[in-house]
């Protein structure tokens, strides 16, 4: 089997994890205590979910996941919540003191004490797999545990499991909505550390998802639960073909092969459609062409940036539900003819398709309407560089005054690491700029040198 281990780091990682496992259980017919639901036991078993769940001797299903946070509050809610019997208690790992929004605490001081214990648990879960495919790491860029411990974990995973895929789902600091003052520091330090260790990083930003909840789903004041359930649908779409059968399956390695033209440029933009509330669902057709076009609307993106300002390098369209391949091909060819969507000239084909026959799962009392088909688009576009330059600008404003730096240095970090990280991100912005240039322009520039 091709198993995948999910690792949820910090508060954001844990809460997104809760939403994801709730959804996986509904999709596979697994009760909150880990047993199969009665209607599922009569049907022949689909083998697919053993990629995400392991079966115990007594016929219980246990998620192949590890939750880790440096302070206990958030994971305690999992230990006492609805799904407390689903998870293996030793795979919920908490420390005693939190990282206090400080990358250095998560990475150097507090995180160091916990990392070996966490790796030991991951090793046990990995030993239980017959053909481990890779890891999904969920964390935020802004928090101390998510940025610091998340980076430390990815570094150590590269050492222990060099060839396995490591995909990140990262909550990126939103342009307007901020949860901590030092987000720009944490984000740039963690990106610098993980740039060479992570194979592919799907970014979501809270503000973009707030806007989707308000605009498309008519939720006046979205809470984290609304946001996380939306993210869970996206994660489920990305992992659906690992868990269900379809005519075009996509595994973890295929994402990298098709989406990452150069190792550093591994931050695809995520878009999902249809995003409609139950009230509007009856008036929408949701044809394949409609939902495919909706993916190219900036309003449906999970990160605030405008793809019309950049060029697409590669695009991966993952359909699920009632899909006929012929419709998909028509929709894609009509998009190719549109002049508004620009591809870089060195990547003429640009589309990777995945089709999975399992329709999107409706979550009871959820925000999204029940639909019979959906699509998730992962696109590597040069416009995501906007997100980096926004962040770099905020970093520069604070760092020019050396504001808050003493908190990091006090935890054993060198001040030089700040400037090193900032230079690395400047290089990343430059990489995006160069990739977007036409190949003829590039040749002329090389000749000038």
Swiss-Prot record:
The keyword Magnesium applies. Coiled coil: none annotated. Its EC number is 3.6.5.-. It comes from the Eukaryota. The keyword NAD does not apply. The record marks 449 as: Involved in polymerization. One of its GO terms (cellular component) is cytoplasm. The active site is at residue 254. Its cofactor is Mg(2+). It catalyses: GTP + H2O = GDP + phosphate + H(+). Keywords: Cytoplasm, Cytoskeleton, GTP-binding, Hydrolase, Magnesium, Metal-binding, Microtubule, Nucleotide-binding. GO terms for molecular function: GTP binding; hydrolase activity; metal ion binding; structural constituent of cytoskeleton. SMART domains: Tubulin (SM00864), Tubulin_C (SM00865). It is found in: Cytoplasm, Cytoskeleton. Dimer of alpha and beta chains. A typical microtubule is a hollow water-filled tube with an outer diameter of 25 nm and an inner diameter of 15 nM. Alpha-beta heterodimers associate head-to-tail to form protofilaments running lengthwise along the microtubule wall with the beta-tubulin subunit facing the microtubule plus end conferring a structural polarity. Microtubules usually have 13 protofilaments but different protofilament numbers can be found in some organisms and specialized cells. Belongs to the tubulin family. Tubulin is the major constituent of microtubules, a cylinder consisting of laterally associated linear protofilaments composed of alpha- and beta-tubulin heterodimers. Microtubules grow by the addition of GTP-tubulin dimers to the microtubule end, where a stabilizing cap forms. Below the cap, tubulin dimers are in GDP-bound state, owing to GTPase activity of alpha-tubulin. This is Tubulin alpha chain. The gene is TUB1.
């Amino acid at each position: 089997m091709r198993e995948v281990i999910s690792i949820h780091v910090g508060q954001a990682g844990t809460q997104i994890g809760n939403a994801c496992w709730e959804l996986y259980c509904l999709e596979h017919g697994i009760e909150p205590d880990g047993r199969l639901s009665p209607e599922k036991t009569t049907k022949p078993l689909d083998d697919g979910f053993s990629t995400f769940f392991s079966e115990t001797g007594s016929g219980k299903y246990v998620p192949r996941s590890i939750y880790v946070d440096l302070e206990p509050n958030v994971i305690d809610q999992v230990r006492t919540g609805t799904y407390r019997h689903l998870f293996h208690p030793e795979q919920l790992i908490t420390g005693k003191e939190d990282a206090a929004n400080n990358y250095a605490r998560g990475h150097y001081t507090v995180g160091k004490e916990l990392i070996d214990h966490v790796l030991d648990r991951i090793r046990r879960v990995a030993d239980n797999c017959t053909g481990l495919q890779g890891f999904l790491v969920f964390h935020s860029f802004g928090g101390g545990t998510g940025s610091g411990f998340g980076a430390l974990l990815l570094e150590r995973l590269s050492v222990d499991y060099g060839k396995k895929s490591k995909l990140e789902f990262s909550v990126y600091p939103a342009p307007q909505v901020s949860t901590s003052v030092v987000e720009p520091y944490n984000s740039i330090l963690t990106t610098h550390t993980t740039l060479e260790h992570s194979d592919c990083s799907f970014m979501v930003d809270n503000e973009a998802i707030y806007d989707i909840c308000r605009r498309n789903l008519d939720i006046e004041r979205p809470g984290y639960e609304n946001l996380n359930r939306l993210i869970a649908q996206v994660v489920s779409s990305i992992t659906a073909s690992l868990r269900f059968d379809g005519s075009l399956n996509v595994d973890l390695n295929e994402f990298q092969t098709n989406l990452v033209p150069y190792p550093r440029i591994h931050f695809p933009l995520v878009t999902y459609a249809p995003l409609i509330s139950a009230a509007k669902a009856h008036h929408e057709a949701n044809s394949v062409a409609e939902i495919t076009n909706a993916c190219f609307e900036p309003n449906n993106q999970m990160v605030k940036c405008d793809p019309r300002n950049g060029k697409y390098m590669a695009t991966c369209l993952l359909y699920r539900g009632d899909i006929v391949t012929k419709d998909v091909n028509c929709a894609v060819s009509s998009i190719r003819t549109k002049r508004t969507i620009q591809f870089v000239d060195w990547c003429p084909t640009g589309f990777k398709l995945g089709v999975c026959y399992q329709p999107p799962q409706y979550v009871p009392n959820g925000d999204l309407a029940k639909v019979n088909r959906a699509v998730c688009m992962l696109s590597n576009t040069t416009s995501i560089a906007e997100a980096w330059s926004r962040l770099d600008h905020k970093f520069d404003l604070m760092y020019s005054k050396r504001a808050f730096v003493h908190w990091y240095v006090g935890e054993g970090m060198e001040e030089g690491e700040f400037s090193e990280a900032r230079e690395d991100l400047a290089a990343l912005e430059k990489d995006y700029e160069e990739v977007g240039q036409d190949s003829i322009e590039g040749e002329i520039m090389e000749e000038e040198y």
